[in-house]
């Protein structure tokens, strides 16, 4: 049966254009009992053990690729997470040497407790085995897996970070065939104030960036590797773990005007060019309600919702009905010993951008296996070119507010889908769109594009000293004339702003071609951002393919002229929510200076 499907798929793939292939429906090959419910691989409207199904077709589109036998073979993915049950019956065949347990300094990566479940779920999304008669399957079911329990409490040292991200104790990236080409990082932080991206103040930032750059550009004979990073889960409810307020949740009135409490550019490592950041969409083909968004999002992938009223992601779980996600109180019809999973080895409740990132990592492994000669830069170009415009009619988000003159005004804080001057479509929710594995592999197999020489420019400092009017659309503006000729991959800025309410600020970067990128949305959860921004870094992919030469414009707009009420939930049983007020700034802010650098090609 499988041989016949594969032969047919090869004939079809050889005979049709990419557009023709995209318009043909292919079945997902059978062989795993849960695969029919894995909507993220093939969405037919199935409920995935929740109350209802989603919208058919909103998925990773892997059917033809899997039918052709392109499933990640020869590519190893690293799971940087908590423990991973590598001896799980659906993971063991893809386990490769190289995993490390930092807690006991051994290669035994078994979860240290029944609740250490996150890493096993992530690993299964990437590369749980196919056609073995159990469970479901991964996006890249023949890729290799290694893991590092860096996220376990007590393991988060710089040395451990470097090892888990591919840099060994001798200071060099390991050069070997089984060295990972894909690193999955399903982790991040939620911040209550903007942070500085300053190498002198935080030397570890340079250590991390230098390591990721070296591994990305030099490993595997120069073909390199790719780091995938989850965008975060802070759109509608901000979770604080390091706040002066203590541990808890934050909500603003009126659902924060429909705007995200956490912008992806507030997390410093999400502003690194070397991290390919993924947001999450649900089974209806819309942004997952929790997904953090922003201009450094590269692509989007399935993360689902919560697996109760609507689907989450089905993947491997720590084995046993008393471990992993199975014992959680949130109801899901798979959990607790379903006939298709009597030993409780799987979960239908994995979600978050923690699930979206490994979907992207698995897709990258498949793309690399389709054409092992592809470089890291080629793979990024393939994703930017072939990702699907999801939620195509989304209007963006307009913020209506009363300005300092008492007039009701509107600011377009998140644009609808935009096409830049190079023809690439981009949305701050979805980046270049939803990853389409079949389309990406179709391009990858015969890829012959010469992208040119990769270039990273030096930062250029621009002095501004421009006043930011309180609660007024006029904002502050500063320009920089760039004389370097290169094709843009991404643009990175750092800003220095004096302001006592950074939550109010929208920051825009406008290219010489007129493309506008909102690199910081207003009304973020930076309620403790009373000291402005010092070297706060932001990244934008919105200008991909455009020419860098010409005048770049930075605008900063203050979008509030009044105080705002919010609620703080201390997350402690029995303690009541606290009603609080965020005070508006009493003086105009100042855009002091900013710097800019380009990542691109000549």
Regions found by a protein language model. Give the residues of each.
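An often Trp-containing, charged/polar helix-loop segment at the C-terminal end
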Residues: 371-426, 562-565
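Gram-negative bacterial Sec-dependent N-terminal signal peptides
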Residues: 1-22
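Extracellular S/T/G-rich loop segment that most often corresponds to the catalytic His/Ser-adjacent loop
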Residues: 81, 254-365, 369
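Short beta-strand-plus-loop segments that form exposed binding edges in beta-rich domains
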Residues: 555-562
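Substrate-binding/access-modulating region of protease and related hydrolase catalytic domains
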Residues: 71-73, 129-133, 148-272, 340-358
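N-terminal domain-start motif of subtilase-like serine proteases
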Residues: 34-78, 104-115, 167, 209-217, ...
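Subtilisin-like serine protease catalytic core
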Residues: 24-37, 63-99, 104-161, 176-182, ...
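Secreted peptidase-domain scaffold signal
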Residues: 232, 401, 405-508, 571-602
């Amino acid at each position: 049966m499988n041989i016949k499907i594969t032969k047919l798929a090869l004939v079809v793939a050889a005979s049709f254009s990419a557009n023709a292939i995209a318009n043909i429906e292919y079945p997902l090959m059978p062989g795993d009992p849960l695969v029919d419910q894995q909507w993220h691989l093939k969405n037919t409207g199935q409920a995935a053990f929740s109350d209802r199904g989603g919208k058919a077709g909103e998925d990773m589109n892997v059917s033809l690729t899997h039918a052709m036998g392109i499933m990640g073979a020869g590519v190893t993915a690293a799971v940087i997470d908590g423990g991973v049950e590598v001896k799980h019956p659906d993971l063991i065949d893809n386990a490769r040497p190289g995993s490390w347990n930092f807690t006991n300094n051994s290669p035994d990566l078994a979860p240290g407790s029944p609740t250490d479940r996150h890493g096993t779920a992530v690993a299964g999304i990437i590369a749980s085995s196919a056609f073995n008669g159990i469970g479901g399957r991964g996006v890249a079911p023949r890729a290799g897996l290694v893991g590092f329990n860096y996220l376990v409490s007590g393991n988060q040292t710089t040395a451990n970070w470097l090892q888990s991200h591919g840099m060994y104790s001798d200071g060099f990236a390991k050069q070997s065939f089984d060295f990972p080409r894909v690193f999955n990082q399903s982790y991040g932080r939620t911040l209550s104030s903007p942070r500085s991206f300053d190498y002198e103040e935080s030397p570890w930032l340079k250590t991390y960036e230098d390591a990721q750059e070296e591994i990305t550009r030099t490993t595997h004979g120069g073909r390199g590797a790719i780091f995938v990073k989850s965008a975060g889960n802070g759109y509608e409810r901000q979770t604080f773990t390091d706040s002066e307020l203590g541990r808890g949740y934050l909500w603003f009135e009126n659902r924060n005007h429909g705007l995200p409490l956490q912008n992806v550019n507030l997390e410093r490592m999400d502003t690194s060019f070397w991290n390919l950041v993924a947001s999450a969409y649900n089974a209806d083909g819309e942004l997952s309600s929790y997904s953090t968004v922003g201009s450094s999002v590269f692509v989007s992938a399935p993360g689902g919702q919560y697996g109760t009223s609507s689907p989450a992601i089905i993947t491997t779980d720590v084995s046993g009905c008393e471990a992993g996600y199975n014992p959680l109180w949130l109801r899901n019809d798979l959990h607790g010993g379903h006939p298709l999973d009597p030993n409780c080895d799987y979960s239908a409740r994995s979600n978050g951008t923690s699930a979206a990132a490994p979907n992207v990592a698995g897709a990258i492994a498949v793309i690399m296996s389709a054409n092992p000669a592809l470089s890291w830069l080629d793979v990024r170009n393939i994703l930017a070119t072939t990702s699907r415009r999801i939620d195509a009619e989304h209007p963006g988000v307009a913020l209506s507010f009363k300005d300092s003159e008492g007039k009701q005004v509107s600011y377009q804080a998140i644009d609808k889908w935009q096409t830049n001057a190079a023809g690439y479509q981009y949305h701050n929710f979805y980046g270049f769109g939803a990853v389409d594995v079949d389309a990406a592999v179709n391009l990858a197999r015969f890829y012959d594009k010469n992208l040119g020489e990769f270039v990273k420019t030096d930062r250029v400092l621009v002095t501004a000293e421009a006043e930011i009017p309180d609660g007024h659309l006029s904002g502050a503006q500063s320009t920089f004339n760039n004389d370097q000729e290169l094709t843009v991959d991404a643009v990175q800025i750092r800003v220095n702003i004096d302001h006592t309410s950074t939550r109010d600020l929208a920051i825009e970067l406008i290219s010489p071609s007129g493309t506008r990128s909102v690199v910081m949305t207003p009304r973020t959860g930076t309620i403790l951002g009373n000291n402005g921004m010092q070297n706060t870094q932001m990244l934008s992919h919105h200008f991909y393919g455009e020419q860098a030469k010409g005048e770049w414009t930075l605008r900063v707009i203050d979008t509030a002229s009044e105080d705002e009420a919010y609620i703080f939930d201390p997350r402690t049983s029995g303690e009541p929510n606290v009603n609080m007020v965020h005070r508006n700034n009493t003086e105009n802010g100042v855009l002091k200076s900013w710097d800019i650098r380009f990542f691109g090609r000549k």
